[in-house]
């Protein structure tokens, strides 16, 4: 269960809480504050989680908001970093997909891969990430005219 600082005038920490299977209350023994954690390659910590998808075995593919520079496309900030999170070890690592606009942060599991909607300086569309090999497509495998802000796989 992710919690975030999005749309708050007074920021709070962002991260994850847990509700154990068969219960209805938050587990007081588990919480992970991502807004105080260092993300390799960045000088500032993530502020919140604009999108995430649980992919099994304690792993989450997500976008985290890391506002480090004035990188933008026109008036649109590029500050959403694709990451793989490990809820068990409370670690996150950047995925080799470009930093995206917050308007294009769709994440969907597709068979044994993960699809990331992304809008960056070079292209707009859908990237493919393979969590087993930790590899990603070097560019959008499907390009879009608008932002890929939502996806749903109607399969197994």
Where does each model-flagged region fall?
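Flexible, glycine-rich phosphate/dinucleotide-binding loops
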Residues: 25, 69, 91, 123, ...
């Amino acid at each position: 269960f992710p919690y975030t600082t999005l749309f708050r005038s007074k920021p709070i920490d962002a991260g994850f809480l847990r509700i154990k299977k068969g219960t209805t209350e938050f587990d007081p023994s588990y919480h992970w504050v991502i807004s105080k954690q260092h993300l390799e390659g960045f000088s500032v910590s993530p502020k919140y989680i604009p999108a995430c998808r649980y992919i099994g075995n304690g792993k989450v593919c997500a976008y985290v908001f890391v506002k480090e520079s004035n990188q933008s496309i026109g008036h649109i900030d590029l500050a959403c970093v694709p990451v793989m999170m490990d809820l068990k070890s409370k670690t996150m690592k950047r995925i080799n997909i470009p930093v995206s606009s917050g308007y294009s942060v769709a994440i969907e599991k597709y068979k044994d891969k993960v699809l990331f909607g992304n809008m960056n300086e070079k292209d707009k569309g859908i990237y493919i990430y393979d969590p087993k090999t930790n590899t990603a497509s070097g560019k959008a495998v499907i390009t879009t005219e608008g932002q890929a802000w939502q996806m749903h796989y109607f399969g197994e």
